[in-house]
Amino acid sequence: MIDTPLHTGLGLRRGLLPELLEMQAGEVDFLECAPENWIGVGGAFGQKLECLAERFPIACHGLSLSLGGTAPLDEAFLGLTRRFLDRHQVNLYSEHLSYCSDDGHLYDLLPIPFTEEAVHHVSARIRQAQDLLGRRIAVENISYYAAPYQAMSELDFIRAVLDEADCDLLLDVNNVFVNACNHRYEAHAFLAGIPRERVVGMHVAGHYDEAPDLKVDTHGAPVKEDVWALFARACERFGAQPTVLERDFNYPPLAELLAETARIRDLQQRHGGPRHG
């Protein structure tokens, strides 16, 4: 791994592998992958991951810890994840602040009820995960459409979890925008309420406008102008944090994705102040 500060990154997807392998150094600062998709993978795909990891630092964004679930954390899987993170010298590992299992995998990221009981439950699981992984983790604010039971606001819930678990936040700017539209809150006020010291990374992605008051987080389209504007505001508040462009399907030519990562870099430079390595 090259010891380079992480500023502007791109999600590592198998559908992008041929072009990523041909990508010139300096186009992005790092790549982000889901460890679940690569743990134990050998053969041609494993070799391609190793090739990319030799050229670019790797960050990881998990999919299946189910931090809000009720079943015990999968300690065997956490052990495999720790070895993967250690092998690739991963300094930024994040997971969704959600649950995705209930007596079986649900194949979706579902919101946790915004209650004090849930704060205590998920915080204990985050602390356990951090102990087993031997590192701090960042939780990501998710998009949600059917609001869970809310004894507190989403912002207050996230703040309480960050404090009680003593973990970090991966701020998904698109999710803030989508949730603000769908649940009628002010996105800038949400950003203002997040503790600066907890934010260690960001995501930007595209969404679908189902209706003026209904946005759907898809990761299948270019980032929209309103999200770019909100990202600029996030850079002003949190600095030039490591930021990943997420694109999960409908892949355009790599040059179009790199134009978006170049825009991330430009907004970081113009709005983020001193960069944080």
UniProtKB/Swiss-Prot annotation:
Cross-referenced InterPro entries: MbnB/TglH/ChrH, Xyl_isomerase-like_sf
One Pfam family recorded for the sequence: MbnB_TglH_ChrH
SUPFAM superfamilies linked: Xylose isomerase-like
Coiled coil: none
Disulfide bonds: none
Superkingdom assignment: Bacteria
PANTHER family linked: UPF0276 PROTEIN HI_1600
Family as reported in the entry's similarity comment: Belongs to the UPF0276 family.
The protein, known as: UPF0276 protein PSEEN3355
Organism in which the protein naturally occurs: Pseudomonas entomophila (strain L48)
